[in-house]
Amino acid sequence: MARMVFCVKLNKEAEGMKFPPLPNELGKRIFENVSQEAWAAWTRHQTMLINENRLSLADPRAREYLAQQMEQYFFGDGADAVQGYVPQ
């Protein structure tokens, strides 16, 4: 049976992830409080942030920015909006 969590992003009980997405405290916090569905939505948003801002994951500042955005997306007021993106 799937592991269930109360997802802080979706504000409902949903299927949790199979393992922590990051090997740190933020990863543990996400594992305990974020559903697979919300994580998938974050990865799509993260991809748009990387592409629109032309981020290089080899750059430590870009990785730090994405970590901050991830924390804001799940536990804060939301991540930065992607410039030029118009939802359909």
Swiss-Prot record:
Gene3D superfamilies: Fe(II) trafficking protein YggX. Keywords: Iron. It comes from the Bacteria. One of its GO terms (cellular component) is cytosol. Signal peptide: none annotated. It holds the Pfam family Iron_traffic. GO terms for molecular function: iron ion binding. GO terms for biological process: cellular response to oxidative stress. Disulfide bonds: none annotated. NCBIfam families: PRK05408.1. Could be a mediator in iron transactions between iron acquisition and iron-requiring processes, such as synthesis and/or repair of Fe-S clusters in biosynthetic enzymes. Belongs to the Fe(2+)-trafficking protein family. This is Probable Fe(2+)-trafficking protein. It comes from Neisseria meningitidis serogroup B (strain ATCC BAA-335 / MC58).
